[in-house]
């Protein structure tokens, strides 16, 4: 059935501690995606409802400066390239505080997207409400939703950020393959590996 966004969006919670350690993360596997509407580097606003007809939507909390993100960026581009024809849409969201980390400003996001030839929307979560509502803690951090907007996988892209030739388990690709084939992923959650989101 088509995705119908909830009538309310959870408001931001001040983030000074690890919310997951307190059991306060908003989204759990099986939960419905929370709606958002964010500006992209392409000059358009993007809402989750825009992609309601997709087989799967991959939301990745990302940024410009984190070395973990930079190590995985090319793989993010390749995943979108390989799965676009199968009805998959990747969305990257930058929620970092640009006042403290100017490299994550919206103009710098535009430069990075152009430099790396991003083939997916790169969105700015200036208020940090989306990251807070999703319970995101790291960059990159993956939230994979099926065509009913249920969370089916959360965690890392694969098991080796440092060397893509040494990857043994492609968690995100495996989860996508499962959803596309009509089954649930064997692995539904892994521990996110990356930089902390830079909260205001």
Protein language model annotation of sequence segments:
Residues 2-189, 196-200:
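Chalcogenol-based redox active-site neighborhoods
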């Amino acid at each position: 059935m088509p995705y119908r966004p909830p009538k309310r969006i959870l408001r931001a919670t001040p983030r000074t501690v690890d919310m997951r350690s307190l059991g306060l993360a908003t989204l759990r596997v099986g939960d419905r995606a929370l709606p958002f509407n964010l500006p992209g580097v392409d000059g358009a606003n993007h809402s989750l409802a825009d992609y309601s007809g997709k087989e799967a939507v991959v939301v990745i909390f990302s940024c410009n400066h984190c070395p973990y993100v930079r190590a995985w960026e090319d793989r993010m581009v390749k995943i979108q390239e390989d799965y676009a024809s199968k009805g998959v849409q990747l969305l990257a969201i930058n929620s970092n505080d640009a006042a403290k980390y100017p490299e994550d400003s919206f103009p710098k996001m535009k430069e990075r997207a152009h430099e790396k030839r991003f083939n997916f929307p790169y969105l700015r979560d200036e208020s940090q409400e989306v990251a807070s509502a999703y319970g995101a803690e790291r960059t990159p951090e993956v939230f994979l939703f099926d065509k009913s907007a249920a969370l089916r996988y959360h965690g890392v892209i694969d098991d080796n950020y440092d060397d893509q030739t040494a990857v043994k388990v492609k968690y995100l690709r495996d989860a996508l393959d499962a959803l596309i084939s009509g089954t649930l992923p064997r692995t539904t959650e892994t521990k996110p590996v990356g930089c902390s989101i830079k909260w205001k």
